A protein has these predicted regions:
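Membrane-interface segments of envelope glycosyltransferases acting on lipid-linked substrates or membrane lipids
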Residues: 1-126
Length: 126
């Protein structure tokens, strides 16, 4: 398997299925001695992460303010470049927009959309 640097982007790590999946994937990779990253606004589940191989970078990715997305996207892009990230897993619509608005690079992106409450808004469907 070729080496890769993964970053997962999730709004928060407080509680829930998305958060549990994020922590489980990060710790699984750490058990395999694969350094990986999480960008999040914070949360109580951070303490469940392997401190040696899972690196948490806090940015306001839980923001619902669409006008802040380009600025946050640029910060994400700088993080991706500084850490030689070649795989991004976006786990929410807001961060997906942020990643989409950042400058284009050769990073593969996976987006997971968890639709629990319905999807009536045009912007939420994008």
């Amino acid at each position: 398997m070729s080496s890769f640097n993964l970053v997962q982007i999730v709004p928060s790590l407080d509680s829930g299925g998305v958060e549990r999946g994020t922590v489980d994937v990060a710790n699984f990779l750490a058990q395999k001695k694969i350094k990986n990253f999480i960008i999040t606004s914070g949360g109580k589940m951070i303490k469940e992460l392997d401190d040696n191989l899972v690196h948490v970078h806090q940015l306001p990715v839980s923001s619902k303010n669409f006008f802040s997305y380009p600025s946050i996207g640029r910060k994400i892009n700088k993080f991706i470049q500084a850490n030689n990230i070649n795989l991004v897993h976006v786990r929410s619509r807001g961060p997906a927009w942020m990643v989409n608005l950042m400058s284009k690079n050769n990073v593969k992106t996976i987006a997971t959309f968890h639709n629990v409450y319905g999807c009536n808004s045009f912007f939420k469907k994008m």
